[in-house]
C-alpha cells in the first residue's frame, strides 16, 4: 500500500537529491529502522530506532488533528487514498501544524549560545511574536507527548554530539515557564521533536 511505500519514497528522494546511492530496504529491520537506514546510509542505533518509533506513534495516535481531518474530509467525497494522503501532507506542512518542528530548529540555529537564549525569547515575547513549539489548541497544561520526547531528545543529543541544541531547548523552556506558563502555554509535541529529528539524521525540510 502507499502507506508502506511512503518511507521508502522519501528516503529514495532524499538520497537522489543529495547525489547519494539509493539504499534498498532490509527485510530484517523494522519500519523505523529501515527508514533511517535508507535515509542516512547506516543502521540506526537502538535509541535512534526507538525515537523514530515513538515519534510515529505519538503523532499518529492523537485524535482528529488538522491533517487527519483533511484526509478524512477528502475520503468522505469518495475520492482516492492518494488524494487523501496528499491533502493530509499539505496540511501537515503548515507552520501551525507539523511544520512547527522545522520552525523550532530554525529558532535554535538562530540562537548562538545557551546564554543567548533568554534574551532571544524575551525579545520575541516583548514584540508579541510566537515562540515555535509552545502552546496547543487543546492542551492547556504540559503536552504529555513532549514529556516523552524530552527524555529521548536529551539522550540522543548526548549520544550524537548535539548537547548544545538540547541545552538551548531546555533554557528556552525554562524562560518560557517563568514568562507564560501561568497563561497555559507549555511545550507541545513539536518542541522536543525538533532536536530529536535532528539527532537521528532527518533533514530540516
Predicted regions and their residues:
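Non-transmembrane, aqueous-exposed alpha-helical and coiled segments at domain scale
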Residues: 1-205
